Swiss-Prot record:
The keyword Cytoplasm does not apply. The active site is at S238, D458, H516. Extracellular serine carboxypeptidase that contributes to pathogenicity. Residues 1-19 form the signal peptide. Belongs to the peptidase S10 family. Disulfide bonds join C50-C121, C325-C361, C332-C354. Transmembrane segments: none annotated. One of its GO terms (biological process) is proteolysis. It comes from Trichophyton tonsurans (Scalp ringworm fungus). PROSITE patterns: CARBOXYPEPT_SER_SER. Residues 607-627 are annotated as: Disordered. This is Carboxypeptidase S1 homolog A. The gene is SCPA.
Amino acid sequence: MRFAASIAVALPVIGAASAQGFPPPVEGVTVVKSKFDENVKITYKENDICETTEGVRSFTGHVHLPPDDNDFGVYRNYSINTFFWFFEAREDPKNAPLSIWLNGGPGSSSMIGLFQENGPCWINDDSKSTTNNTFSWNNKVNMLYIDQPNQVGFSYDELTNITYSTINDTVYVADFSNGVPAQNLSTLVGTGSSQNPWATANNTVNAARSIWHFAQVWFQEFPEHKPNNNKISIWTESYGGRYGPSFASYFQEQNEKIKNHTITEEGEMHILNLDTLGIINGCIDLMFQAESYAEFPYNNTYGITAYTKEKYDAIIHDIHRPDGCFDKLAKCREAAKEGDPHFYSNNATVNAICADASSSCDNYLMDPYQETNLGYYDIAHPLQDPFPPPFYKGFLSQSSVLSDMGSPVNFTQYAQAVGKSFHGVGDYARPDVRGFTGDIAYLLESGVKVALVYGDRDYICNWIGGEQVSLGLNYTGTAEFHRAGYADVKVNSSYVGGLVRQHGNFSFTRVFEAGHEVPGYQPETSLKIFERIMFNKDIATGELDIAQKPDYGTTGTESTFQVKNEIPPSPEPTCYLLSADGTCTQEQLKAIKEGTAVVENYIIKSPAASKGDPPPTTTTSPTAAPTAGSAMLQAPVAMLAISVLTALAFL
């Protein structure tokens, strides 16, 4: 697995707030000291930065946790300052349920989801103004976006001077004791976290422990959210295919310990009433999904033949051969079971075995795809992919925005420290205690709804692998889920947005013509799926009450592969300074480095880029089935780019 950083910089440094472009001092924040622990506090500020609907409130802030020498067995000698952005529901917030949103990475900010996928606003191409998102997920649900683990996005451990290279998308710790260096197109300065990989969670399970502490504080002590509805859901994406099952099952386990009085510490006995786990294009378990990295580029519903039969066979061989991907995964999991049963990642031998497994599988599965020059997050787009747009990075660089947010740090889309920490212990090769598919089964047995939603153009966590996960679960409803067929997802009177297999509380949905960030491609379809699940309706029509019909199952075909899609036109290239490594050509990067590029609102106007070649197809391109539809439902702005980098992070 490869990792990348991307920072939006308003150019602050510690002790240099008077310099032009630096965010002003944090002022006007409300401070709430915990009634349970004097060292714990919440700071927050109300604002209308993104949600401009009259009467609908939103708040940005941090939950501040001190170091802890025994965090459920984990020694944590660093502070955690976790950023949140809370949006009340546009309709009846007092009685609306609440959903947490988490992006993946590991190390990616949830501002990706907020601004590129499902939040109340889209950022326009001037990187300064917003457009209302009528398909926002806070239409009927209170939404809580969290940057986690520590050092991700606006979350931080300690304020640190940094420089940021737009050329290689990297953050460096800086010493400004002799003055702040001059800035140019390729080098920016700012304030961030320590960049210390030891000052953040080092695996998924430890991240679950941290987010549970955040939730205990926020749901008990954040004064602006006192609902009549105490249901909590988690929706997540990408590496969230691991976060979601692990976090939700950890919450559920802690609930059980609170109920049986195993946990009795004051301030840590709040029941988190779990309702739904939603996973969008999740990378859940390589044991189920590894083969899809060969299958999807070779045989997909768009007729794109990125791999030859020889390349496909070679990857499958590397997965199954002795000392191949599966062998290494099995050795890692056995070593972790014996040497790190509590998932502290403090056993150097286990860490080395699992890091080797993770790196080896990455090499076997993903290295061949680099040669295709196709998008990791959208196989129909070029590698330098200008969709969805990165304009929110410039937006979050504005001094006025940072002031309204009350943020002491610049925005960092990707936390390198988190990537290094997780990669160093081989987190992607490991399961948690039950395994992530076991977590999903446990949640279903506990009455929690689970929805797997996959856009059908994503390579990195593709729908073919996601479907294999859905069919590989072992729970009491397995046979009934397998017997269910695929039904159309009816979005409106004229559009079918995908196909869904559902039995009771469990579902798998393939969303047509969507890449990795499904709501950014198909806002209306995604909102319908989200709200139907959240309010106990069947996903196919939204007309049946699943709570009243727990044995409901969809009927239809056993497979969705017969429904083909047309390849969309390639997006217009847009080189964006704050996503240069993922959106710009080598010529443009050279001009940025030399300072000769012409830049307007962070967009490189000169030198211009030409549109990339279309993806390779089979001799006869498939025709779109009537149910697939070909009109992409997009935001009302020119949706352009998320970083798709040669150094890769799951979003």
